[in-house]
Amino acid sequence: VETKPISTLRRWSLLSIALFATLFSNVFINGVAFLIPTLHRDFGLDLALAGLISAMPKFGMVPTLIPWGYVVDRAGERFVLWLGSALTAAAALAAAISIGKGSHSLVLTGGLLFLGGMAAASSNSASGRLVVGWFPAEQRGLAMGIRQTAQPLGVGLGALVMPQLADSHGMGAALMFPAAVCALAAVVCAVAVIDPPRPPRAEAPPEDLANPYRGSQILWRIHAVSVLLVVPQALVWTFALVWMMSEHGWSPASAGVLVTVTQILGALGRIAAGRWSDKMGARLRPIRIIAAAAAASMLLLAFTDLIDSAWSIAVLIAASVVTVSDNGLAFTAIAEIAGPFWSGRALGAQNTSQLLMTGLTPPVFGALIGVAGYPVAFAVCALFPMLAIPLVPADRDSANLMGTNRGSPGQPV
């Protein structure tokens, strides 16, 4: 199928749009976690219940990630990006209004955060497909690494802005911030996004249309590995701010700045991991190495926190970087293996499994912290990346699957 070529500048501009649309969605999805101190102080919630409220956007994403992926496979990236961003903005605005009515509105606010998560799920598959579709294989690791910085940068932006808005103007004002930036993303996506080329379904070879989950365990194993590796990431992101404030006496502003710095470093780590995978010509071997490093960093964090060492802050920074570095590699591998007619659903399945675990992590570990303390929680968390190490498939297996069963996502045939 012939398609009008785009310039290198246009390709990178599309990457920028995909990055910022996903970044702003992540401000909404992850920013509520930085309102846990406000929920505790102003509404009297304990850590477990505040963690549950903060996880509502993530729970909302779980039932819609695969359906959004199906819509992307059928209707294209542009439609999904602008519609999902607009709906996320509307839900965030409604939540901001509802929370102003006081503690009796927390159930309504939680429901609206859940609905916003359902809408925000749209950006994950759509932006990933947009990047994979417009970049050649030898640049995909780097490009997807850049796109995957949306999550840590979104977390960092949320940590920088939302706690201070909540402290000075209340939780409603804090929720207005993701409403505004997601509305901006909706307009930009509607105007500027170009869907990548792919062959019509009627002209596609049978192997491109075949279900990539049948006859192979590769995608299932990548999903399982990613679920295990997201636990330390979610733990560090959710409780870093409150840990620094309650255990080390940091102010909300100072703790927010440090969290933002760690997220920027994490974003750079994702880019470096993507470039590393391009140079190696492998996506999965680096994931195995990162899993080992994540386990080591969480164990060291547990030990330094147990002995009340000042080095625990530095170890937290290192853990924040290591635990996010694998995401782009798994995302790229899944899109390449699944092909142009299944990558939306495969990426949706990837995010569904990850975000279900991400949603469970705050309340479960919040309860564990309340009972046993932070060092025990950090040590238990280290078990998850340990379990992931032997599950990572060999790169030769995924290469064989791509070579025999899949076309290149988004590329004309």
Labelled PLM ranges:
Residues R74-S85, K279-A292:
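Cytoplasmic membrane-interface "Motif A"-like loop-to-helix N-cap segments
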Residues A86-G102, A292-L306:
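C-terminal ends and interior cores of transmembrane alpha-helices
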Residues T64-G76, R270-A282, I369:
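Helix-to-loop junctions at the C-terminal end of transmembrane segments
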Residues V32-I36, I218-Q263, A267:
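Extracytoplasmic gate region of multi-pass secondary transporters
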Residues R283-A330:
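C-terminal transmembrane helical hairpin of 12-TM major facilitator-type secondary transporters
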Residues N30, K58-I66, V155-G156, Q263-A267, ...:
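Residue-level signature of mid-helix packing/kink "hotspots" within the transmembrane helices
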Residues R147-I194:
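Helix-loop-helix hairpin linking two adjacent transmembrane segments in secondary transporters
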Residues L112-Q151:
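Cytoplasmic helix-loop-helix junction between adjacent transmembrane helices
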